[in-house]
Amino acid sequence: MPAVTYEHIKTCKQSGARLGIVHTPHGSFETPMFMPVGTKATVKTMSPEELRQIEAKIILGNTYHLWLQPGNDIIKHAGGLHKFMNWDGPILTDSGGFQVFSLSNLRKITEEGVEFRHHTNGSKLFLSPEKSMQIQNDLGSDIMMAFDECPPMPAEYDYVKKSIERTTRWAKRCLDAHQRPEDQALFGIIQGGEYEDLREQSAKDLVELDFPGYAIGGLSVGEPKPVMYKMVEHTEQFMPKDKPRYLMGVGSPDALIECSIRGMDMFDCVLPTRIARNGTCMTSQGRLVIKNAKFADDLRPLDENCDCYTCQNYSRAYIRHLIKAEETFGIRLTTIHNLHFLLKLMEDIRQAIREDRLLDFKEEFFEQYGLNVENPKNF
């Protein structure tokens, strides 16, 4: 039996949304689920205890960054990533591929792997399917990702076609190199840019390899959202119904709802934590930029409909002061709020699927979120 399995509970009668449970060696979580990103073995400014309090069930670690610092050997010596960072829930690690393709301009792709420069000190590095598997086996995550090529968007058809074929060959090498299939599940990543036939080919080729789960990669990289939704809708039909489906890099409220409707189960994104650091907050009325002068004496919470620690205890005026003064506590408060907001949104999505009313929920949510006149429909 694979290390990770998917249990289907029901499909929403209004949409293609799925309610399910993903079972892992470190516990189970209901889907659709958002996964906070802990790039360097920490979700920035948050303790594992705080993550549990806001109902985070699974978090993401970054293979590329952890390989470079502190090094996978140190994490292995500590007993794996769970012990190293004191998180006993499920962890997903990416393959390092996205960082190699996005952070480094000086890269050379060969059949063997990718040669590139360290994003800070310029030293030469090499990452291959085998190396990515070795690092992720050392990290000991519950879900590992296959090492894939991430073509830019847009890219020429012929280039993307060659790229997905290489991604499939690399996926086979990942399966061969994976040392711990009994306690770590390896997911394949479907690529194909904005070309429907290539997405289909990539999905079918990878499904033949029988991974325990599948991701859609190469979206949410700056393309218009309708293009992303179209690609998800098209690709979903070629993904197994009995395995988890992970849409990589998606974390805006509208996209989480739209892509849950289109049958996706798992999502991750740095968006809620990244925007929190400059004082941008997600609220039920839309985005709120706390640095704005009008909040200087506003004693209301960030969101009057929110029961997170931040909203129960602190005012907009206080949080604005902290962010303006560059106090770390301000970033902690906005991060707690944004992550709580998205995890609560996922809970609401799951409840709407249970009640067969996800399209109704979408309409209600969008209408309220768009009430922010200053920032209409900006998710």
Curated annotation (Swiss-Prot):
Give the binding site residues for substrate: D94, S95, G96, G97, F98, D148, Q191, G218
Q: What biological-process terms (Gene Ontology) are attached? A: queuosine biosynthetic process; tRNA wobble guanine modification; tRNA-guanine transglycosylation
Q: Which InterPro entries match?
A: ArchSynthase1/Queuine_TRR (IPR050076), TGT (IPR004803), TGT-like_sf (IPR036511), tRNA_ribo_trans-like (IPR002616)
The metabolic or biological pathway listed in the UniProt record of this protein is:
tRNA modification; tRNA-queuosine biosynthesis
Q: How is the cofactor bound?
A: Binds 1 zinc ion per subunit.
The catalytic activity of this protein is classed by the Enzyme Commission as 2.4.2.29
Q: Which PANTHER family did the record assign? A: QUEUINE TRNA-RIBOSYLTRANSFERASE
Annotated family: Belongs to the queuine tRNA-ribosyltransferase family.
Q: How does it assemble?
A: Homodimer. Within each dimer, one monomer is responsible for RNA recognition and catalysis, while the other monomer binds to the replacement base PreQ1.
Q: What is this protein called?
A: Queuine tRNA-ribosyltransferase
